[in-house]
A protein has these predicted regions:
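General structural concept
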Residues: 14-15, 35-38
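Glycine-rich, proline-tolerant flexible connector loops at the mouths of alpha/beta enzymes
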Residues: 17-31
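Active-site region of glycoside hydrolase catalytic domains
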Residues: 25-27, 37-402
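Catalytic domains of carbohydrate-active enzymes, especially glycoside hydrolases
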Residues: 1-18, 228-234
Length: 402
């Protein structure tokens, strides 16, 4: 697969390291040498082809041992264990890795409770479950800040960023209440990245927690840790947009990336209801850069579609080429017209893989077709889609030949 990425001309490849591959039990004193060897082999292969790795330390894979013993990230013990793991990664892989992300879609704690936070509601009969979510998120914020600080100490030339789900909502109407509701909704998208960029809880998040009657426990050094561990860049996933309204009564909803919104009558929808919107990417880039004044990195963007192998043995996917073309143009405008500092882009998928949003193989994203069905049956052979050659041309021309 890496050789195929090199054929496309990849300059960067996003990957993640599985915590449990490095420490089979997070409380082990010594890392798993076979796990370290596995990732070293991957990184060396990327280096052979001059592909820069972008490495995520935690991507929806909280070790089960932490869920069982500490109730996931609700237990503060997870901070020290994560830092031990992160330190091991920096020490063993730092020679090959310049760009790091601490947590994938860090805002996902309140959506993907188990995979992102290791939180199981049945384990919490002594504290309101929602309060436990805020506390778990605080522990991840502290862990992220400590990882940034330690990463810079071990790998002085490294760039360590955060990663968020870039949900984008337009007000459904120009009614003031719809605009206010949308503003409040977008605040909830940014609240945790605000901490990672500015090094402190935003006032609106403090008020949100207070107004719910919850208390998030801080240790005495937490505020200083957050201040000292701000990120170098902001990365995000972007797929589509939706609308938002103060009331959805009588309105048609559309599914989206983890959240439903109000359907936008001006946008096309995929088979799965996601409303594709290249202008929304430019809008998001400007919004993010104006807010954070940090370099931006798009680390997930793509189109899920039901690809078919034709009688000629090929996969013709002009719809993916069109999606890519439109989004590259949006990035170009954000850079050249709006002055956004966009430092990188990675397509979601590269090869076909199981769709996280629908749990199926049929929703395919890759430039490379993988012969597997929804039940794991198939030859696992790879086929270059038409979009493979198209993306190769995009990379070679730095987006000028579309």
């Amino acid at each position: 697969d890496i050789a195929l990425f090199a054929q496309m001309g990849f300059k960067v490849y996003r990957m993640s390291i599985c915590w449990s591959r490095i420490y089979t039990n997070p409380e082990d004193k010594v890392p798993n040498e076979k796990g370290i060897e596995f990732y070293l082999n991957v990184l060396k292969e990327l280096k052979k082809y001059d592909i820069e790795p972008l490495v995520t330390l935690s991507h929806y894979d909280v070790p089960v041992a932490l869920i069982n013993k500490y109730r996931g990230w609700y237990g503060r013990e997870c901070i020290d264990l994560f830092i031990k793991y992160a330190r091991t990664c920096f020490e063993h892989f730092g020679k090959y890795v310049k760009y790091w992300l601490t947590f994938n879609e860090v805002d996902a704690m309140l959506r993907h409770l188990v995979t992102s936070g290791g939180l199981i509601e049945d384990q919490f009969d002594d504290v309101p479950f929602e309060q436990a979510m805020y506390q778990a998120m605080h522990h991840q914020m502290v862990a992220s800040a400590l990882a940034v600080k330690i990463g810079h100490e071990i790998c002085p030339d490294s760039q360590i960023g955060c990663m968020m789900t870039k949900l984008c909502f337009y007000p459904f109407t120009c009614k003031p209440e719809d605009n206010l509701a949308t503003q409040q909704r977008m605040r909830s998208v940014y609240r945790y990245v605000d901490i990672q960029v500015f090094g402190e809880y935003p006032i609106y998040l403090k008020k949100e927690i207070d107004n719910k009657g919850f208390e998030v426990h801080f240790e005495k050094d937490d505020e200083e840790i957050l201040k000292e561990g701000t990120v170098d860049f902001v990365s995000f996933s972007y797929y589509m947009t939706s609308c938002w309204a103060a009331s959805t009564e009588g309105l048609e909803l559309s599914p989206g990336n983890t959240f439903n919104g109000v359907k936008n009558p001006y946008l096309p929808s995929s088979e799965w209801g996601w409303q594709t919107d290249a202008s929304g990417l430019r809008y998001s880039l400007v919004e993010l850069y104006d807010r954070f004044r940090k370099p931006l990195f798009i680390v997930e963007n793509g189109l899920g579609a039901r690809d078919v192998v034709s009688e000629d043995g090929k996969v013709h996917d002009p719809y993916r080429e069109d999606y890519l073309k439109e989004h590259v143009c949006a990035m170009s405008d954000a850079i050249n017209l709006d002055g956004v500092n966009l430092i990188g882009y990675t397509w979601w998928g590269c090869i076909d893989l199981i769709s996280e949003s629908t749990r199926e193989m049929s929703k395919r994203y890759g430039f490379i077709y993988v012969d597997i069905d929804d039940y794991g049956n198939g030859t696992y052979n790879r086929i270059k889609k038409d979009s493979f050659e198209f993306y190769k041309k995009v990379i070679a021309s730095n987006g000028t030949e579309l």
